[in-house]
Amino acid sequence: MENKEAGTPPPIPSREGRLQPTLLLATLSAAFGSAFQYGYNLSVVNTPHKVFKSFYNETYFERHATFMDGKLMLLLWSCTVSMFPLGGLLGSLLVGLLVDSCGRKGTLLINNIFAIIPAILMGVSKVAKAFELIVFSRVVLGVCAGISYSALPMYLGELAPKNLRGMVGTMTEVFVIVGVFLAQIFSLQAILGNPAGWPVLLALTGVPALLQLLTLPFFPESPRYSLIQKGDEATARQALRRLRGHTDMEAELEDMRAEARAERAEGHLSVLHLCALRSLRWQLLSIIVLMAGQQLSGINAINYYADTIYTSAGVEAAHSQYVTVGSGVVNIVMTITSAVLVERLGRRHLLLAGYGICGSACLVLTVVLLFQNRVPELSYLGIICVFAYIAGHSIGPSPVPSVVRTEIFLQSSRRAAFMVDGAVHWLTNFIIGFLFPSIQEAIGAYSFIIFAGICLLTAIYIYVVIPETKGKTFVEINRIFAKRNRVKLPEEKEETIDAGPPTASPAKETSF
């Protein structure tokens, strides 16, 4: 505990925050218009892929009087799928500039442009007989997802009081999963996943963006952004009054003032400066491990293998899409369960339990895939493994990193940290999508042993390095990491912040 100077008033006890209507509605508006987009567009092209390929082929035939060969079709479809994470990588690199210049809420509002324009283009692509519009739109939608995947957790984490930060923060992943699930439902052949309905299926991505444009302007900007980066304590106080539903906010304001003083001392960190700074070494490594572990632990491989596992268990190909919807229900239920438990059990317990379940499921699934031809009954165990893996990933590795990555950085470094975090997320997403088919072809079922090993290593890192952040302020978490980084934080001076935004040295003002 730090020694206080003589005459320093005792710390102001914080008042436990409650989920006020303004905070709830702001969370729903922000998450539905942003995270939902990510999940919906991640999944919407998967089930009806044969319908899209047929449109590509018909369009090509009308232009060239011949159908595409297999290699060209594979190339075009690979571009359709893989352009989304590449666009996400670009969006993650843009987000740092946007969140500082336009604010967290302003960034989310501007980002809707990258959803509405592609929705229109994809909606008219059939009439225009231009499959290129779909490929281009997937890139732009990736940019939208890349921006929202970083800006949304930042906004929600800065809106919520510390005792609700975990639950509110997991809403990012909850709405991603809801987006995935509704895309699975709408893309069923009986609904919109057919030759007549697919333009509407793709254009629906514009609806959440329009709803966010109509609702989010009525909710406050992040009070931490207003006070720490804009120096506007009056606006921050007004926002807190609306978000908390009471006027007893001095403890929270003082915590923000402490962060503001830290930002004035450090300046606004660039990505390069962040990577070189000893005082943030373990925080930076932690978000890299969390985001890489999330993608490299096998979730995309499980999805890739799922239909094969269902078929081997006797599920007809025409019915496998409904089993996929069932796995989506498990995904939603367990992600919501995580949101309920994260403030009771803490972040570490959910992460460790999730990786433990995922690693165990991967090991058992390896055995199932190797021996199911000899023992047909094992194929049913394969379905259980898929559902168990999805449940494990949904309770920890999927939702909790969105909370932790906001909590372990102060305002001065959060922008740069989220750029690194987003880049790792999208790069590993792309790498797995690109390399897994080759790995699977080379070693088959043994590929899941690799994923089990990654789950184990990630869990060990979490157990050894990442502290429990439940119920702690950003400043308190920063002090915990300062001890691990073996740096001494400067004594906080009792001073009020000046009006106006904090200044930074020229070397620290750029995004990179």
From Swiss-Prot:
Glycans are attached at residue 57. GO terms for molecular function: D-glucose transmembrane transporter activity; fructose transmembrane transporter activity; sugar transmembrane transporter activity. Residues 491-512 are annotated as: Disordered. Glucose and fructose transport are inhibited by the flavonoid apigenin. Expressed in small intestine and colon. Weakly expressed in testis and prostate. Pfam families: Sugar_tr. The keyword ATP-binding does not apply. CDD domains: MFS_GLUT_Class2. Keywords: Cell membrane, Glycoprotein, Membrane, Sugar transport, Transmembrane, Transmembrane helix, Transport. One of its GO terms (biological process) is D-glucose import. It comes from the Eukaryota. Induction: Expression is increased in presence of fructose. Residues 43-78, 129-138, 194-198, 303-321, 372-379, 437-445 are extracellular. Probable sugar transporter. Even if its physiological substrate is subject to discussion, it is able to transport glucose and fructose. Does not transport galactose, 2-deoxy-d-glucose and xylose. It is a multi-pass membrane protein. Belongs to the major facilitator superfamily. Sugar transporter (TC 2.A.1.1) family. Glucose transporter subfamily. It comes from Homo sapiens (Human). It is found in: Cell membrane; Apical cell membrane. The keyword Transmembrane helix applies. D-glucose binds at residues 294-295, 300, 331. Disulfide bonds: none annotated. The chain crosses the membrane at residues 22-42, 79-99, 108-128, 139-159, 173-193, 199-219, 282-302, 322-342, 351-371, 380-400, 416-436, 446-466. GO terms for cellular component: apical plasma membrane; plasma membrane. It catalyses: D-glucose(out) = D-glucose(in); D-fructose(out) = D-fructose(in). Changing residue 302 to V: Abolished fructose transport. This is Solute carrier family 2, facilitated glucose transporter member 7.
